[in-house]
Amino acid sequence: MATTSPESATQSVKGPSTRILVRFTAAPEVTAEQYDETIRRLEKAGDWLPEGLEYHVAFRADGKFRVSEIWDSRDQLDAFEKRLMPVLDDVGVEFASRPEMLEIHNIVKR
């Protein structure tokens, strides 16, 4: 399966202390069941919830499954990506486009 690694996305997000927002859009054929199976496999392997992941939101919009996450650092995302990508490949999850990564300036919580 051809997946796009978060590592190959925008290179402007650098350094271990920069909090980032990463947004993934799955290919149109990816289902909620594939997402759920991915989470089950990560939990079984002891890889869910990964260190550094502050928020994980999964939803469907415009006919595609999407995930938005906030990470404490790019390094933590990269470490998790090494464990995540083989699971996504095995489950058959492909991305519609490269993940988008943005440096976070501010987070406001109620």
Named regions from a protein language model:
Residues 1-66, 72-86, 93-110:
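Short S/T/G/P-rich N-terminal loop/turn motif that feeds into the first structured element of a domain
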